[in-house]
Amino acid sequence: MTALLQVKDLTKRFGGVTAVDRCSFTVEAGSITALIGPNGSGKTTVFNLVTGYLPADAGEVWFDGIEMRRPHPAKLYRKGLSRTFQQARVFGELSVLENLVVAAGHGWRDMFCARVSTGDRKRARELLSEFGLAQHADLPAAKLSYGQRKLLEFAAVMMSRPKLVLLDEPTAGVNPVLIETMEHHIRARHAAGTTFLIVEHDMALVMRLCSPVVVLDRGAPIMTGPPAEVQQDPLVLDAYLGA
C-alpha cells in the first residue's frame, strides 16, 4: 500500500506541557485507520496540527507525497484532505442544502448571485439523499437534531471528493441507531475510495471498523497494529484501558 499521510516527529507544546511528543505514524491509502488513546493523550491536537488549525513546534506532515509546510486548512481542503470536529460544525442559519453548497467552495455571494453550478447543486442533493437528509434540504441546519448535524457535517466534507477524511469522534453524543448509520456511511465512502483517519472512543466500533489502530499515550504512539493485537498489548492495557 501507498502512504497517503505521513506524520514525522510532530511536536506541540503549550507552555511547559508537551501535548504531542515526536509523534510519527502513517495512514496508508485505502485504509480506515484509528487514532485512539486515553483522554488528554493528544489525539485532537494531532488532528489540529495535521489539518493546519494549530502550528507545530517541530516535525513534518506529508500528504500524498508532498510535505505540507505551514499547512493551512483551506489549502489542504483543495488538495483533498478534509475533516470533521468533535462538536458538529454547521452553518445553522443556512439551509441544509446551502451548507453543502458552501462546502463546495462557494461563498455567500455566489449563492445569492446564482453563481453555483448545476453540477454542485446536483452533487449536494445526491449527498443529502445518500445521508438521509434530502427531506430536510430547505430546513435551517439549526433545526436538525445533533445527530443529523453530525451527518450533515460528514456529507459536507464529501462535497470536495476528498482523498482523506479525518473524523474526530464521529459517533460522540449520538444514539445507537445513528452510530450504526454513521458506520454504514463510513463503510460506503471507504468502498468508494475514500481513506479515513478516525478518532473514536467507541472501542467496539473501532475494533470492527478500523485497521490499523494507532494508540497514543502522552502525545506519542505506543502501539500500531491490527485491532486484535492492540486489544492484547500490555502497554495499551496499561495506558488506555487502565489495567
Model-derived features: where do they sit?
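Glycine-rich phosphate-binding loops of nucleotide-dependent enzymes
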Residues: 2-243
